[in-house]
């Protein structure tokens, strides 16, 4: 199974926390600046990761500056790679280099895992590796497993895993030691080849330097000869240096240069001699290594023979496993055969139970057939209720006609009331004219005659008295204050008279209305009582009809439930019958393989049982289903008709107290009574 995501990183972090460091190293952000990693490397190998190198790592003022983090991490990784190549002679070409930019910017856990993996390799391969290994062994088992897996991955990148690695567990001790020797020789050979390659590089460089020096010496000799031929030489500043003679300045300079070149030539020749000696030593080493390689080839041939033997043993082991698996399958088949026997017995018992249940269901169906009589009685009651509803609807039509007549009478009374109100308004206007006193005498006389005809005697006397007071006030020569007081008193009296006139008019109108409309009020009250009685009767009938409908629907629901139960039971019986037949067929096949005589006897018994089951199966009753569908359709039709009739009657009752135009504006009921009767 693959380890969870970043589990190895957290294990390496727990190991890194055990180190005694000055810099913080508890989480990914503290490790991203590279300071803690540099201190750990200095602690592991101070001879390689020196204090001078550690001082180059910027510990202060790093913060969130990813560029400084990047520079620190570059120094750390470069030093680690140099340590692996120079000190440990490990080649990390196959190991994926950690992405330092992602670590510096985002603190990526996967890249930090790779960097910590490299640091772990340095700790395990340093001089004090035993102490660090003991610290790792003190950790938890899960952490130890993850750390070992990290080391194995690092080792696998250093040297690719050989195909013999999977067989190493099944080899003998001799083969294991041979493999270890071959690995060690391979490592030595790689190291010597690397050293030979490096010495050859150095030798080529020295040869190039020697050729360059010889060329320069040849050039100098040519120039010296040329200068000796010329008598005068002009320097860089244009001054003649004179002939090259012993004791001159030019001669001394050239002599000094020649001595230097000779010394360099001697040094290069000494280096060449040293390289020759080293090359001879390496040739001898190569001869020894070739001898050892031949020995190892022989041991590898032995290892291949051992591998072949292991492959043969493995094939035999695989065959043994296949045989064991076949044996297990045969055992399971035998157990399945026993289980099938038990299931056949159980299915026989269940089939008997299902036959009994079918008989019970048939009896229940006969019982429910008796409920049909009750349903028919409910049908008759519903028809009677429909007839009563039709009679009540005809009565409601008659009452509506009477209501229209009463509305006509009410309109006539309303017109009379309007005429009386107009007369009252005329009287008010006459009173206002009297108050102002600005009309002519003729108009005053006509107004008084009209008021005398309409008003009672007490009001006439008051008006006469007020007119006399008015005349006296006009003829009098009192002050303005007295006139104002008299005018206020007159206004108050006029207002009192107005109120008295209002009360008198109201009494007159009420008396006239009572005298004219005694009989219509009684008729209206009687008509209202009749309407209320009819409404109560209608509500009672609707309640009775709803109760009957609910009873019929409940009975119908029970019938449908029983039908569904019957169909479900029949389906279950069919399913179990199919299973039973399959089990019987399997049992026959097994018994045929054991003894063919028993199989023929079983066929006969199974055929008899299947014939009995076919005879016991209930036959469908189409007539019962048709009757149930007819009754349900009739109930639905009756409910819809009843609802439409109630809606139409309610619409008629709602429109009885309104005018003809208001009734025409209202929405019609869903279906008329004629349509219901046609149904």
From Swiss-Prot:
One cellular component term from this protein's GO annotations in UniProt: endosome
Coiled-coil residue spans: 135-437, 480-574
Sorted UniProt keywords: Coiled coil, Cytoplasm, Cytoskeleton, Developmental protein, Endocytosis, Endosome, Microtubule, Synapse
Superkingdom as given in the UniProt entry: Eukaryota
Major location category of this protein: cytoplasm
Annotated signal sequence range: none
Alphabetical list of PROSITE patterns matching this protein: CH (PS50021)
Gene3D superfamilies: Calponin-like domain
Quaternary structure and interacting proteins, as annotated: Homodimer. Interacts with microtubules via its N-terminus.
Name of the protein described by the UniProt record: Protein hook
Organism: Drosophila sechellia (Fruit fly)
